[in-house]
Curated annotation (Swiss-Prot):
The protein's name in its UniProt record: Phosphate import ATP-binding protein PstB
Gene from which the chain derives: pstB
Species of origin: Aromatoleum aromaticum (strain DSM 19018 / LMG 30748 / EbN1)
Annotated SMART domains: AAA
Residues the record lists as binding ATP: 73-80
Topology in the lipid bilayer: Peripheral membrane protein
Stored PANTHER family: ABC TRANSPORTER I FAMILY MEMBER 17
Length: 289
């Protein structure tokens, strides 16, 4: 099993500026990060199998509270597989198998424990996918959906939570007058923010983003990135992205994965500018991947 570099790092390889230099004023290297922020979740010696194929190999990864952690690496390296394991999406397909644990703190719940209800896991850990996936319902009912599953029936409570979630997703001003319209009437960027609001309505502790801007235009992408920057004040975020400039812009910490293994983990600025592992350097400079 490969070791993980804790925040703070080790002796560095030659400087790399191409990716880090592309980041804007919101880049997380401008923030003063504590040496060891509090943990919100952690993968512990976690392996995953699609049938007989081992897709993830003994992953140990810290996820820090109210920070953004980016997962980068070439296609097929296991980024999305790891992300989906965090809220039990793999349970929906037969033949999949876990080893190890993914824990949510502070109660230290092993999210993979069969005794833990996957629906409750998905309430605590929301997920936003590559392409916007609003339900064939009204804007209002999309946001209220998770609350209704939880048994909420009070209209006043639902109204308040829907408004709060839409404001949290920076969408309220655009849809307040059209809550009963179909969600599919929204633009692609608005639909993605609606999906974020749907997650926020259940007050999640962690948000998972699986390439959330890959299907969006540059303006909508900038809007989602700005929203992620705001959301980190309230929730912990884990994001998969193929866009290394995006990882540099939005994340505090970055993990580089390859062939199902975690190769390197550290503060984003450090990993992009002074990676410890040669494999990481080759990937972020375009010599591989």
């Amino acid at each position: 099993m490969r070791s993980i570099d804790r925040p703070g790092g080790q002796a560095a390889r030659p400087t790399i500026g191409s990716v880090a230099g592309a980041s804007n004023t919101r880049t997380r290297d401008a923030r003063s990060l504590p040496d060891t922020p509090p943990l919100k979740a952690a993968a512990e010696n976690f392996s995953f199998y699609y049938g007989q194929f081992q897709a993830l190999k003994s992953i140990t990864l810290p996820v820090y509270e109210k920070h953004v952690t980016a997962l980068i690496g070439p296609s097929g390296c296991g980024k999305s597989t790891l992300l989906r394991a965090c809220n039990r999406m793999h349970d929906l397909s037969p033949g999949n198998r876990y080893e190890g644990a993914i824990r949510l703190l502070p109660d230290n719940t092993n999210l993979l424990d069969p005794a833990v209800d996957p629906i409750e896991v998905r309430m605590r850990i929301g997920m936003v996918f590559q392409k916007p996936n609003p339900f064939p319902k009204s804007i209002y009912e999309n946001v209220a959906y998770g609350l209704r599953i939880r048994g909420e029936k009070s209209r006043s409570v639902l109204d308040d939570r829907v408004e709060e979630a839409l404001k949290g997703a920076a969408l309220w001003a655009e849809v307040a007058h059209r809550l009963n319209e179909p969600a599919f009437a929204l633009s692609g960027g608005q639909q993605q923010r609606l999906c974020i609001a749907r997650c926020l309505a259940t007050d999640p502790e962690v948000l998972l983003f699986d390439e959330p801007t890959s299907a969006l235009d540059p303006i909508a992408t900038a809007s989602i990135e700005e929203l992620i920057d705001q959301l980190r004040q309230k929730v912990t975020i884990l994001i998969v992205t193929h866009n290394m400039q995006q990882a540099a812009r939005v994340s505090d910490f970055t993990a580089y994965m390859y062939l199902g293994e975690l190769i390197e983990f550290g503060q984003t600025r450090q990993l992009f500018v002074n990676p410890v592992r040669r494999e990481t350097e080759d990937y972020i400079t375009g010599r591989f991947g």
